[in-house]
Amino acid sequence: MDLRASLVLITSYLFFSVAKACSNGDCKLLDPCSSNGDCQAGLYCFSCPLEFSGSRCVRSTTTNQFKLLNNTLPFNKYAFLTTHNAYAIEGEPSHTGVPRVTFTNQEDNVTRQLNEPAIDTLKEIEAFLSANPTEIVTVILEDYVQAPNGLTKVFTDAGLMKYWFPLKNMPKNGQDWPLVSDMVANNQRLLVFTSIRSKEESEGIAYQWNYMVENRYGDGGMHAGNCPNRAESSPLNDRTKSLVLVNYFPTIPFKQIACEHNSANLINMLHTCFGAAGNRWANFVAVDFYKRSDGGGAFQALDTLNGKLLCGCDDVHACVNGSTSLACNNDINVDHS
């Protein structure tokens, strides 16, 4: 066999090996792919030109920290993924008869984000809570409802009051929240916060800034190494508020660069805000286009937060079940399903 024939054979073999590297649900995280069906459970096929060429399998689901470890700790000892302006769904028409004056910054409907009238969205939340009796949903409202008891009425009409977490059980002086297991057992699985102070007294709806601190949202909150508090919030290191919310999204959402934002830069900001919050890890992390990333994305950021909160490890999968101290299993095999 001459040299040319050998090179042709070698080239053909290499092409065949690469083309057949994985398919039919066998492709792992960051493996090249051509369709969602190529990727393992918990992954999907996505292109992020800013970080890699072609398409690769990236994460599409969160880790259920309650199932992986336990739900026996206070609510503020866990972290949760938060979708910024969850109603602003690409391709979703307005249901109010007037155009929606906002940027779209999510691609999945509310049901997918959890598993335009307010009633439609709230009914989706009710359906989710009904179908998932061990799950907890937190709603943080930028509240523009002016009608007296208008917000209470829409939650009542959506059938959500049976899940309502009562105001009297919310700690105001930095104490721990009730145990998640107790919240589930008592079916108090819906936490609602409003941005209007008076509604805490008039409607029994928690005023957000009495219970949590929050960093600045938009471009002002995305400068590396700096985590300023939102204007309405107490300073991030105010320990009389036992919940911490970290925003990481630009003022104007741009989905083509969201995959870069929702990756290493996001995790770096969580570490920065940890210091700014008096060495407290975030309980909520809010992003745009939450499924877009260059690999683990917002889901890996959440695994990092829960690892830090629950056992001091860099990944929740490294936590030794039953331990609440620095007991890390560094030989981890992550199942993203």
What are these regions (language model features)?
Residues D2-H336:
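Catalytic cores of phosphodiester-bond hydrolases, prominently lipid phosphodiesterases
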